[in-house]
């Protein structure tokens, strides 16, 4: 056994008909962990339903259907590997809660693959001002996904017909809009592909001799290896807390930063409780330590299952322990709110595993959504927000909550604003004010029963 390959998370973004499912399905199909027998079974089903045209998309379709029904998916389906990395597709849009998943998602994407349709009309529609392409790319950038690959798809379509001129035109347009968002187009690979025929997916296409760049697989292999945050203090947002007979209380969550090991004293925020970790396990095996990305259960002493719950955060008592957040300032971008947002607005925030109503106590300033620079105020009226606006906002949680600034602990510093059953805005936390310990009501607030989602 050599050194294990590095794991890389990718998110696939782009307009609704750009061919994301076919392209992703193709990669998983060719380099992934899908059993050949399963593939044959799916192909047979697809052809019986007269859906051969869905060549690779059925892979993703099957996955989405299972996801929607809440079935735990055979995770191998979302994975594929290259000579250098193991890839996991952490989400693909088209899923109802894509935006929410991308923000509260269990993991940070290391790279975004933006799929663009090249045919006449399709490209223009996808990149239009109100198209999803821009919104997805802006979201990816705002949420800290700093590497991007652009796959220019459907090069085999009649209107495109593998044309270099069309490719050049698209590269120019896309470069200009991703540059406005904050990406550096010179560091982005633009790969002309056919997710359908496989041109430039794994092997070079003989139909585009003019193209000298990498195939999609080579571009994925050339991703810069991300630094994992194991040297930061420990943070584990709790997903669940179990009471296991003969063992006791076992909180479960994903290590986002730092390292947890038996014998360590951990603090749970916002409850303000500290206790010793007796053991750490993953997949029913005891571990000497767990690192970022690991989903673990850890057994704790003398804490009842009533005192800690989903949405709380565990950290090392001796190294910047997590604390209750009294209020915080965030840069918020409004995506789809039907009206105007005024100070006093109190939607639900999904931040890591917490799901808590927070009040927009003050809308401080509107800002440029790309640079973050303050936009000069007009007149003295209170600032009001509408779709497309970005602003610095001070928020106050309606009940005890623990969040962190995005620069210190990224997964605990980004959130989705939910209202009317949809994501109306996203935010990145710039600074937090911690509640002074020992204030009356600390314990009581923490033990209040949580409303289930």
UniProtKB/Swiss-Prot annotation:
Top-level taxon in the UniProt lineage: Eukaryota
GO molecular function: actin filament binding; actin monomer binding; calcium-dependent protein binding; GTP binding; GTPase activity; translation elongation factor activity
Swiss-Prot/TrEMBL GO biological process terms: actin filament bundle assembly; response to alkaline pH; response to bacterium; response to reactive oxygen species; translation; translational elongation
Amino acids binding GTP: 14-21, 153-156, 194-196
Compartments (UniProt record): Cytoplasm
Residues in coiled coil: none
Cysteine-cysteine disulfides: none
EC number: 3.6.5.-
Region named G2: 70-74
Residue ranges of domain tr-type G in the record: 5-230
Region annotated G3, chain positions: 91-94
GO cellular component, one term: lamellipodium
UniProt keyword annotation of 4Fe-4S present: no
PANTHER family: TRANSLATION FACTOR
Family stated for the protein in its record: Belongs to the TRAFAC class translation factor GTPase superfamily. Classic translation factor GTPase family. EF-Tu/EF-1A subfamily.
Subunit-level organization: Binds to actin.
HAMAP family: EF_Tu_A
Protein's name in the database: Elongation factor 1-alpha
Taxonomic source organism: Dictyostelium discoideum
Source taxonomy: Eukaryota, Amoebozoa, Evosea, Eumycetozoa, Dictyostelia
């Amino acid at each position: 056994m050599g050194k294990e390959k590095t794991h890389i998370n990718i998110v696939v973004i782009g307009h609704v008909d750009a061919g994301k499912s076919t392209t992703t399905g193709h990669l998983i199909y060719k380099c992934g962990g899908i059993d050949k027998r399963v593939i044959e079974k799916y192909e047979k089903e697809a052809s019986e339903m007269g859906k051969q045209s869905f060549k690779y998309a059925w892979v993703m379709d099957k996955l989405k259907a299972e996801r929607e029904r809440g079935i735990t998916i055979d995770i191998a389906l979302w994975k594929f590997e290259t000579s250098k990395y193991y890839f996991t597709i952490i989400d693909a849009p088209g899923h109802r809660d894509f935006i929410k998943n991308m923000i509260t998602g269990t993991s940070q994407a290391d790279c975004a693959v933006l799929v663009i349709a090249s045919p006449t009309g399709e490209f223009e529609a996808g990149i239009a001002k109100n198209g999803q392409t821009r919104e997805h790319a802006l979201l990816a950038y705002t949420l800290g996904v700093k590497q991007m690959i652009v796959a220019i798809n459907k090069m085999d379509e009649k209107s495109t017909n593998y044309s270099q001129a069309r490719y050049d035109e698209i590269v120019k347009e896309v470069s200009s809009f991703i540059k406005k968002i904050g990406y550096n187009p010179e560091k982005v690979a633009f790969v002309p592909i056919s997710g359908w025929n496989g041109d430039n997916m794994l092997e070079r296409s003989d139909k585009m001799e003019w193209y000298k760049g990498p195939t999609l697989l080579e571009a994925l292999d050339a991703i810069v290896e991300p630094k994992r945050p194991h040297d930061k203090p420990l943070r584990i947002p709790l997903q669940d807390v179990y009471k296991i007979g003969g063992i006791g209380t076992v909180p479960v969550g994903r290590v986002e930063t730092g390292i947890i090991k038996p014998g360590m004293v951990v603090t749970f925020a916002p409850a303000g409780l500290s206790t010793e970790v007796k053991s750490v396990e993953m997949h029913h095996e005891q571990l000497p330590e767990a690192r970022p990305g690991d989903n673990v259960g850890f057994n704790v002493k003398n804490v009842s299952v009533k005192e800690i719950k989903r949405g709380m955060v565990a950290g090392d008592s001796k190294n910047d322990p997590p604390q209750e957040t009294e209020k915080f300032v965030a840069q918020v971008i409004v995506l789809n709110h039907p009206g105007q947002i005024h100070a006093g607005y109190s939607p639900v925030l999904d931040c890591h595993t917490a799901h808590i109503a927070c009040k927009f106590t003050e809308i401080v300033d509107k800002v440029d959504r790309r640079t973050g620079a303050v936009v000069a105020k007009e007149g003295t009226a209170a600032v009001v927000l509408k779709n497309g606006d970005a602003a610095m906002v001070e928020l106050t949680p309606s009940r005890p909550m623990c969040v962190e600034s995005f620069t210190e602990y990224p997964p605990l510093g980004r959130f989705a604003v939910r209202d009317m059953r949809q994501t109306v805005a996203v935010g990145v936390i710039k600074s937090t004010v911690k509640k002074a310990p020992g204030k009356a009501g600390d314990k009581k607030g923490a033990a209040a029963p949580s409303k289930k989602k």
